[in-house]
Amino acid sequence: MPVFAVAGSGTREQVQDLRLDVHMQLVDTPRAATILLVAGAIPEELAEALARLHDSIPHPRCTVWWPLGAPSGAWLGSFPHHVAIEDQVPGRLTAIQRELLSGQRPSEPPILPDVDAAPWRGVGPFGQGGTGMTGGTPYGRPMAELGPDRDGLRLDVLPLTVGPFFPRFPAGLVLDAKLAGDILVEVAVRDNPFVTNSVRGNDRAGRGPFLRALTEPVSLAELELARARAHLRWVADALAACELAALGLRVLRLATAIMPGDSEPVESLARVLGWTQALGWSTRGVGRIEAAALEGLGAGPVARASGLPDDLRAQDQAYRDLGFEPIVQAEGDAAARWRQRLAEATQSLELAGRAGDRRTIPTGSIESPRGLLEPAGGPAARLLPLIPGLLEGMEWGDAVTTLVSLDLDLEEASAAAGQAHGEAVAS
């Protein structure tokens, strides 16, 4: 059952867990799907992009909304034929797929009007939008313009927009890029759609231990188990991005089953990945970030993989009583970020096993799995400005590897602000 899934606000893990069901096939392109599954709430700023994604799914097709506690938003008005489901997701999707293929359920019509992507009729010397050998918008599609190359040549440069639902990127991330072949010669990052207050995380997202720790005491064991699971979930997604989907599923199962003190399976996983030369070839030396560029950003594992012992837990007496010390790497590349998260997952499980009844003291900030989290923002907000300079000059494959290794979460800042606002209202 081919499904293209869009994880809305606060639903990242629930959508990820669908991969564990043998009846589900989450595909990487809408052209291979029959069902568009939308989980949670979608920012209004992404409604048009979601409609374009819907219209690129071939017939027969159906949109399914899985609310997961989220209220209906304005975006649903563009999907009048959608089906809402609450539970038994694989079974319901299987039934909808069967109805589509048998003709019992009609295919959904397009949402957007059938208009040209850009004016082209009667434009140019031949009336088809082109302006010569290069340039223009023939039949509404842009052609490559000549531009400078890193080797001093002038080659074709093609504009390309990637996101906001590209499966390898975090939901909401949009890159406006220019490519010469597969080389990124120019990159711009659009504004984070999750910080415009058009959507807030749903109730399930608001109950996460790191968000709660901003305003209330939380068990260290709960926090460290959640940290280890978050790192393993990242490993599972990163393996899928490296075309190692079967191994990624094994890691995802481990992430859902791991318990405090269970560090041996993670150590074994780290050894297996160390032997997997495919990962070494694709990550070693890729996306290197110097420590100076990360100083003071609270970038968590990304900073520690570049040699900065930057970790709020080192200032917490409860952690110091457990003998906690930050783990660091030296290389600062994608491979180091892989090693960093695996090492921290092992460390967190050991800490969770020894934490007993120790609890945090709320200070308004917390070391999340991705770095310093506070109501003013999460680590993704501080890393996004680095992306253009980091990616420009890279081959596309290395750029994807680099972005995956950063483990960006664009929703985190919005969710943290919403949690703090909710606590203020309640008081």
Write out the residue ranges for each language-model feature.
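Iron-sulfur-associated redox domains of electron-transfer enzymes in respiratory
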Residues: 1-118, 345
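Metal/cofactor-centered catalytic core regions of large enzymes
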Residues: 86-93, 97-427
